[in-house]
Amino acid sequence: MSARKYFGTDGIRGRVGQGVISADFVLRLGNALGRVLTQIRGKRPLVLIGKDTRISGYMFEAALEAGLVAAGADVQLIGPMPTPAIAFLTSTLRADAGVVISASHNPHYDNGIKFFSAEGEKLDDATEAAIEAALDAPFHTVESERLGKAIRTRDAIGRYIEFCKASVARGFTLKWLKMVLDCAHGATYHIAPMLFRELGAEVVVIGAAPDGLNINAGVGSTHIDNLAAKVREYGAHLGIAFDGDGDRVLMADDQGNPVDGDDLLYVLARSWQASGRLTGTVVGTLMTNYGLEQALAALNIPFQRAKVGDRYVHQALVEGGGTLGGETSGHLLCLDRATTGDGIVSALQVLEALGRDGHSLRKALSSLSKVPQKTVNVRLDGGAAKAIVEAANVQQALQQAQAAVQGRGRAFLRPSGTEPVVRVTVEADDARLMQDTLDRLSGAVRDAA
């Protein structure tokens, strides 16, 4: 496949008002999407549009709507909703595509566009390529009698809450649970508190007063220390934090210890194995902690690593017939319950596992020993990151680093595809070994730069 002009691994994202993150580009993007869907479907397409709570979402929602309607597509405006909710609604409302206006865990001054297929999955490469090609064609407005219509959908919240509840057993209850819930002033702010309270939990809510500018600002999954402090303050059993668009989830245990995506993956894998639910291989990424790999091996649970990005985790799960995977950042995939990473659904799966296994998140993690891991970003003065990584002296240093931690950890290099940076990561069961190996390897990269 040729290099993408606009799309990254998870749609389009950037600073509002700069480059493609502008109203005029998004207007053309909506028009291109409408034309491509009409050609593929051979009929008037229906497109759902959702967004998170950042203020620029209003501008981009209007631009997308206008571009789609001009191309002859009908539009249903969902309003602020978690990204995975749009994936679900696109499928259940029989739409031809879903669009989410969000920059996920980024600050309010960023925004982005991501797409879902009619099946509620990430848009395939061929369709994205067709949209990019259509963007280079002139804006097209169909005849008046063929213009699309736009309506607001009023029952989306109720539909999504029932979908989330259906992901756990019918008798599932959270009456045992006192929790702190951090909604990142984002797309889960009006849904997650209602859902967990309906299931019986005592809920202390933070980060649920969006003003368009405070999304992810000192709250949410990128600021887990805030959640941890509140868990200790209120004496809660645990805390749950989502990111701005609700596709990530991290937690804190009853002592306020941060619980990342690797930890949650372990809780689910062990519980699902015991209940017979686990199928295929558990999938992590290059960044998944070596300690998790070792812990799963001790349980005879097969594990494989994909490239960083939930798109690649999803691809590996589908190819290998698995249903459970995720990233350290909190993107968890439970493909027997949802088509994409869903923070609320993933949190419910963890709570269901805890309900079976003694209610304590801290105890559920007592048999997982993660190893020290650190990443250093080496900025390059000149030359492409990929070329630096492939240089003979850097490859020699990498082989030496890998030999130093063999059987005790890992060492690897990741050239950035978007900036002149090489990411150097080392992990080992001994902190001094990890740091010494990291210093030598990152030094070799700096010397080559």
Curated annotation (Swiss-Prot):
The active site is at S104 (phosphoserine intermediate). Binds 1 Mg(2+) ion per subunit. Activated by phosphorylation. This is Phosphoglucosamine mutase. PROSITE patterns: PGM_PMM (PS00710). Catalyzes the conversion of glucosamine-6-phosphate to glucosamine-1-phosphate. It catalyses: alpha-D-glucosamine 1-phosphate = D-glucosamine 6-phosphate. Gene3D superfamilies: Alpha-D-Glucose-1,6-Bisphosphate, subunit A, domain 3, Alpha-D-phosphohexomutase, C-terminal domain. The keyword Magnesium applies. The keyword Signal does not apply. It comes from Xanthomonas oryzae pv. oryzae (strain KACC10331 / KXO85). Pfam families: PGM_PMM_I, PGM_PMM_II, PGM_PMM_III, PGM_PMM_IV. GO terms for molecular function: magnesium ion binding; phosphoglucosamine mutase activity; phosphomannomutase activity. PANTHER family: PHOSPHOGLUCOMUTASE (ALPHA-D-GLUCOSE-1,6-BISPHOSPHATE-DEPENDENT) (PTHR42946:SF1), PHOSPHOHEXOSE MUTASE (PTHR42946). It comes from the Bacteria. Its EC number is 5.4.2.10. One of its GO terms (biological process) is UDP-N-acetylglucosamine biosynthetic process. InterPro entries: A-D-PHexomutase_a/b/a-I, A-D-PHexomutase_a/b/a-I/II/III, A-D-PHexomutase_a/b/a-II, A-D-PHexomutase_a/b/a-III, A-D-PHexomutase_C, A-D-PHexomutase_C_sf, A-D-PHexomutase_CS, Alpha-D-phosphohexomutase_SF. Belongs to the phosphohexose mutase family. Keywords: Isomerase, Magnesium, Metal-binding, Phosphoprotein. Mg(2+) binds at S104, D243, D245, D247. One of its GO terms (cellular component) is cytosol. The modification Phosphoserine is found at S104. Its cofactor is Mg(2+).
